[in-house]
Amino acid sequence: MFSIIQKIEKEQIKKNIPIFRSGDTIEVKVWVIEGSKKRLQSFEGIVIAIKNRCLNSSFTVRKISNGEGVERVFQTHSHGIEEILVKRRGLVRKAKLYYLRTRTGKAARIKERLN
């Protein structure tokens, strides 16, 4: 039974996912269906959390839109994600950056990792 589940998961896992960590600024291009139309929508922000659970892996991206914080959780191996682009590497010392929810302006900035 376990080998069957493992085999199915192996087929579903995407291979073209770039390596990114918490604190990185990424752009996620997602397919959006509106009525009968299908288009690509871009969501760019800072990765504040990553949950690695094989096929059930997910990551949370936060951005500020019109002065309001917007967070979106993406399933890493979802078919709705077209591509993930890493724009900037962030230098952080924590895995979960939930403290950014309470910060605004310059206090919410993250230093850039140079390597």
Swiss-Prot record:
NCBIfam families: rplS_bact. Keywords: Ribonucleoprotein, Ribosomal protein. GO terms for cellular component: cytosolic large ribosomal subunit. This is Large ribosomal subunit protein bL19. Disulfide bonds: none annotated. It comes from Buchnera aphidicola subsp. Acyrthosiphon pisum (strain 5A). PANTHER family: LARGE RIBOSOMAL SUBUNIT PROTEIN BL19M, RIBOSOMAL PROTEIN L19. GO terms for biological process: translation.
